Amino acid sequence: MLGEVSKILAKSSMAIAFTGAGISAESGIPTFRGKDGLWRKYRAEELATPEAFKRDPKLVWEFYKWRIKKILEAKPNPAHIALAELEKMGIIKAVITQNVDDLHREAGSKNVIELHGNIFRVKCTSCSYREYLKESDRIGWLLSQELPRCPKCGSLLRPDVVWFGEALPEKELTTAFSLAKKADVVLVVGTSGVVYPAAYIPYIVKESGGIVVEINIEPSAITPIADFFLRGKAGEVLPKLVEEIRRISK
């Protein structure tokens, strides 16, 4: 099956990747779901909401600083690196991700569409101010005891991520859906396929005549529509795909 998928990817003209928390879990980042996930340690659905931030911004920022610290301790794994490699080879045209950890870019992927925002970006709760935290600023920023405030208007800054009950960023969602309509193959990597509207992406590819390839450690909500299901860790399966594509493309 791996050989067949490799041939399909090698011949494809418009392949995309759609990634979820599973790919980051292999880098040691706790997920919101699953037995080792954040759900057990914190009731994340109570913290990652606009209402929680209004009620107790300090608590929400403590939670996010803890998440940022976990992400800073993580490094891109072989799956992230393999996807960046597939982009360099001209096979993957974009990585659409539900993750907020920036690991795809760190691995070398250039065209990354972040549907749920970026944990290293902050935005003002009142005006249009946004800021991406440079690597050199991150540690000092984490150590600060003060609640971050907007340099333009003085209002509180919040993480530029999509919270429960919030709409996805329109520009990113439109771009993702447009790519899905044009894609001839989608690699669905490490996603449960239950968070909408992001989870529509494999369905759009399928409905537009494309091939759905799922890579996951266990079946998901996407599995029934997958043309190929490659069971295993993304960090093991994706590098093998890269290797096989290189071999058959010689």
Swiss-Prot record:
Keyword Cell membrane recorded: no
Positions that bind substrate: 64, 67
Cofactor dependence: Zn(2+)
Catalytic activity: N(6)-acetyl-L-lysyl-[protein] + NAD(+) + H2O = 2''-O-acetyl-ADP-D-ribose + nicotinamide + L-lysyl-[protein]; N(6)-succinyl-L-lysyl-[protein] + NAD(+) + H2O = 2''-O-succinyl-ADP-D-ribose + nicotinamide + L-lysyl-[protein]
Assigned EC number: 2.3.1.286
Active site residues of this protein: 116
Record GO terms (molecular function): histone deacetylase activity, NAD-dependent; NAD+ binding; protein-malonyllysine demalonylase activity; protein-succinyllysine desuccinylase activity; zinc ion binding
Protein name: NAD-dependent protein deacylase
Annotated source species: Pyrococcus furiosus (strain ATCC 43587 / DSM 3638 / JCM 8422 / Vc1)
